[in-house]
């Protein structure tokens, strides 16, 4: 009996501390070069709670041995194809090495002989990242789609679940999902074309809104929640597309009209200002300061001769004061970020929760920089008033949408850097003085998944927990015949609308 207990304890300890019969190979030669791996994770800085960085070795070899070392018990893995790191032991190793680094050594067996590559490092931050990430998965097309879904991913694992699929909402278009300060229980999104309406989710309840009024250009489009959760700012847009017949670029997307409005949730009323709904301007992409006292937005002069002169459309980022108690805006607009003299248009802004940095996308023209290869990310420091290019994050292809972690230390952004077609998601660190880390591709259980996946990632949004309302509940809400119509407040400025129609484009 004592002998049996001894063996049971031995087996348990081996499972706990990773005892495996990995016989250390006799190395014939040290190659003194780094292994070629995909994704290219070497030198990345990791959140302490990120999923394993599984990778594929692209060099020639019959068998691989990988050793991951740091404080605590090392991980040794043998592989013939993709390298899959045990998730429990990975989490333990990250926890033990936060603020330090891991060393990864790869050895290759070729024709019975072993060769060892130079080790590469992964740095482990003490900063964690929010637990979940929401995004839309859609074919990288311009106007048509077969299926799309808004999904959520647990970032400490590979678990992906559906928030809503258009299979449950009438095969329609679903877009512009946004959360209140990363709260998974407060969410807004739009249904387009079939079962059209805005879906508002609060505390497990779901309601459908008709947001077209006689004083709005269109239904609500790009949203941002006020930090109080009582109001949501929206743009209203008429968006068009033009295609090239002989040009390296494929498409140009632009607004012919756009305004910004404020929706008061409890009052079911809409407000705006002549400074946010100017017929001679295009206003777009509203977002609030963390204290809720400023509304930032993108704006440029309206041009009638489109698409002929879309190269002259260059947006700036401005701000206007906001009184949340009375839903009133100030009488002055201030310009924060202006790159028009440098020949650039600045759009797709987001602000860190601590209010220190504004991330934005700069391109030669327009407001839909996701399809402009020259589009790069910039960072504006609200304390120093300095704007810098996020050189460490940029690539020759388009970088566009950004989302911030709740501790303001991590940014996830979309990039087409791998093939110029599919938007994929990259994670990068920023410290309190603006130092940037190398971005790394969102980890997948199968490291080749992104090379095989035929869906693009659209509009990443970090959230502090899992969205728990069921896809069936959202789908039923979307397909409901009745919807509550919003109304313009009698106390608000009411713009005159010459043309009002729904958008006909779907851009990702």
Stretches with model-predicted labels:
Residues 1-26, 508:
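Bacterial Sec-dependent N-terminal signal peptides
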Residues 19-508:
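Sequence signature of WD/YWTD-type beta-propeller architectures
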């Amino acid at each position: 009996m004592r002998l049996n207990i001894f063996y049971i304890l031995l087996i348990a300890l081996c499972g706990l501390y990773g005892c495996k019969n990995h016989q250390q190979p006799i190395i014939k030669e040290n190659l003194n070069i780094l292994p070629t791996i995909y994704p290219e994770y070497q030198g990345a800085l990791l959140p302490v709670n990120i999923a394993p960085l599984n990778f594929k070795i692209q060099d020639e070899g019959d068998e691989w041995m990988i050793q991951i070392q740091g404080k605590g018990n090392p991980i040794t893995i043998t592989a013939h194809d993709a390298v899959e790191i045990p998730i429990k032991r990975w989490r333990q190793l990250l926890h033990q090495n936060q603020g330090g680094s891991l060393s990864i050594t790869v050895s290759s067996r070729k024709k019975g002989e072993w060769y060892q590559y130079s080790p590469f490092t992964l740095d482990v931050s003490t900063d964690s990242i929010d637990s979940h990430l929401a995004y839309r998965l859609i074919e990288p097309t311009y106007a048509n789609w077969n299926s799309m879904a808004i999904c959520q991913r647990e970032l400490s694992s590979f678990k992906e679940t559906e928030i809503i699929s258009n299979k449950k909402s009438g095969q329609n278009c679903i877009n512009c999902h946004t959360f209140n300060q990363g709260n998974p229980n407060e969410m807004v999104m739009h249904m387009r074309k079939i079962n059209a309406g805005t879906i508002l989710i609060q505390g497990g309840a779901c309601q459908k809104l008709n947001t077209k009024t006689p004083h709005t250009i269109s239904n609500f489009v790009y949203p941002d929640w006020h930090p109080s959760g009582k109001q949501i700012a929206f743009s209203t847009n008429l968006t068009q597309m033009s295609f090239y017949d002989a040009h390296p670029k494929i498409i140009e997307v632009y607004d012919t009209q756009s305004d910004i409005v404020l929706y008061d949730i409890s009052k079911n009323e809409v407000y705006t200002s002549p400074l946010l709904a100017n017929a001679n301007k295009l206003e777009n992409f509203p977002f609030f300061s963390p204290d809720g006292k400023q509304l930032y937005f993108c704006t440029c002069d309206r041009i009638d001769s489109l698409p002929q002169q879309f190269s002259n459309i260059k947006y700036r980022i401005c701000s206007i004061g906001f009184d949340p108690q009375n839903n009133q805006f100030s009488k002055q607009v201030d310009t924060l970020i202006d790159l028009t003299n440098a020949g650039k248009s600045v759009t797709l802004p987001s602000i860190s929760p601590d209010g220190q940095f504004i991330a934005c996308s700069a391109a030669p023209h327009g407001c839909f920089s996701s399809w402009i290869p020259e589009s790069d990310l910039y960072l504006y420091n609200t304390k120093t008033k300095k704007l810098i290019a996020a050189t460490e994050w940029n690539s020759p292809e388009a970088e566009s949408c950004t989302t911030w972690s709740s501790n303001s230390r991590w940014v996830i952004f979309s990039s087409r850097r791998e093939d110029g077609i599919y938007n994929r998601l990259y994670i990068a660190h920023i410290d309190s003085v603006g130092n940037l880390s190398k971005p790394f591709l969102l980890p997948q259980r199968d490291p080749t998944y992104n090379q095989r996946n035929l869906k693009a990632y659209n509009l990443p949004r970090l959230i502090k927990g899992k969205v728990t309302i069921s896809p069936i509940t959202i789908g039923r809400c979307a397909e409901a015949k009745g919807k509550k119509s919003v109304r313009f407040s009698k106390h608000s400025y009411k713009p005159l609308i010459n043309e009002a129609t729904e958008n006909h484009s779907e851009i990702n």
